[in-house]
């Protein structure tokens, strides 16, 4: 079920402060963050965030198409190694 429109998008407060500091400084640094649940806002476009996936920070460069999505959507937490090979085919 989606979030109510009257509540607005959820973003952790400290993330807004960090993004504002980087914008003011003009430096292009990766903003480390642990909040995968935060929504990407239009003011984040052009910034790079290091989204934590449980073991390391994955760099995510925000563009216009990402606005409205959650940060966690762009940093997968599980590694897919593919399905196991068919054991019957190996023996032949």
UniProtKB/Swiss-Prot annotation:
Record has Methyltransferase as a keyword: no
Name recorded for this polypeptide: Small ribosomal subunit protein uS19
HAMAP family given in the database record: Ribosomal_uS19
Taxonomic lineage from the root: Bacteria, Pseudomonadati, Pseudomonadota, Alphaproteobacteria, Hyphomicrobiales
Function text: Protein S19 forms a complex with S13 that binds strongly to the 16S ribosomal RNA.
SUPFAM superfamilies: Ribosomal protein S19
GO molecular function: rRNA binding; structural constituent of ribosome
Family, similarity comment: Belongs to the universal ribosomal protein uS19 family.
């Amino acid at each position: 079920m989606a979030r109510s429109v009257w509540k607005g998008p959820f973003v952790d407060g400290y993330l807004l402060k960090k993004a504002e500091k980087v914008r003011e400084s003009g430096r292009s640094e990766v903003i480390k963050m642990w909040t995968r649940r935060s929504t990407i806002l239009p003011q984040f476009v052009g910034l790079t965030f290091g989204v934590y996936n449980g073991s390391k920070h994955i760099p995510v460069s925000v563009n216009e198409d990402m606005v409205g999505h959650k940060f966690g959507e762009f940093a997968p937490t599980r590694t897919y190694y593919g399905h196991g090979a068919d054991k019957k085919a190996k023996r032949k």
